Swiss-Prot record:
The family this protein is said to belong to: Belongs to the ESV1 family.
Name of the protein described by the UniProt record: Protein EARLY STARVATION 1, chloroplastic
Gene Ontology cellular component annotations, sorted alphabetically: chloroplast stroma; starch grain
Gene this chain is encoded by: ESV1
S-S bridge residues: none
GO molecular function ontology, one term from the record: starch binding
Region spans: Disordered: 106-127, 396-426
Amino acid sequence: MSEMAASSAISLLDIKLRRFGVGASNHELRLTKWFKGDQAGAPTRRFTCFADMLAPIRRSEKSEERRFDQKMSAHGAGIKTSSSAVPFASPKSRFLSKQEKFYPRCTPRLTGPQSRDTPPKRDTGIANEKDWGIDLLNENVNEAGTNEDGSSWFRESGHDLGDNGYRCRWSRMGGRSHDGSSEWTETWWEKSDWTGYKELGVEKSGKNSEGDSWWETWQEVLHQDEWSNLARIERSAQKQAKSGTENAGWYEKWWEKYDAKGWTEKGAHKYGRLNEQSWWEKWGEHYDGRGSVLKWTDKWAETELGTKWGDKWEEKFFSGIGSRQGETWHVSPNSDRWSRTWGEEHFGNGKVHKYGKSTTGESWDIVVDEETYYEAEPHYGWADVVGDSTQLLSIQPRERPPGVYPNLEFGPSPPPEPDLPPDQPQ
């Protein structure tokens, strides 16, 4: 009964948090603070165009399809509009609309970026680069504007240079509603240097009129591993959101690492809270590329009244031989603890030793005939990530002058990144 209660509580909490994760109104265009720009000599252009002064922007069929591509829009894809002028006069010109006739009254013709005032969704893992629609401009841009409803927007782009051939190309955009209750910003970038390092990334943040706030970042990196000298691709994502109407919020950190010999590491850390309930989850997978695999999961939750419950397991295998073990546990508000532990030993000959016990007196220790099944290779590996990283791999570094070579000295390992909110003692 304790297990069922614990499982039901976790499911209910998860459903509530999922509901919050996508709870945000999607108003037309709310934009962020005016942006002065940090590029010397790059003036900021601002102006207001009203509906009866704007001509429809002509687009090719491909551009039109992209504008209404729901998948691209959901992940923050940029909208490309044709920069070509109105076509030369033709017999159809006499049918131009009134708006098109008044087109010269509003120049230059700028349109603000599409609003992205929606929090990220929970448990969506690491998106592929194509889902972001990252489109960096080649020229420096610094522009801003005001919409008919009073909302404002900005958009800018540029590049930074550094030692060892370092170059970072970036684009930044954002917007704010007329009263400041809703705002958002989004930054895209690509980095490279002469060592072969390449990086593609996105960072976005915002808030809406309900007081919900969020932050999200995504990165994809190609580099040479300092120990194996093999090419490695790493992808990561961090997401968090907080409710403006109740004591609720969540955080997720996801990562994936791959190398050309099949070595793979994947994992996630998650945390959530809904009023008096909190929950945590961690899991990881490690494949050495030679048949050895390690997988583990640890989940737990608690209430402010003192009830705690959780479940964890781990498996290790190589060449058909390995083990599995786990524990399910529950602690009541008066500190009464119940737990059940279990384990399996797989000998690789069709025999499996199963054992376990619980605090209520259960116990078992048997050997059974049973086939061993486990995943010795990741379902998504090096070949897959290379195929999904075409934009990363196509980043062009700065041209290296003759006789100049990159500095390949690897410095000390960076300190580990801060983890989730402190784990609760069990």
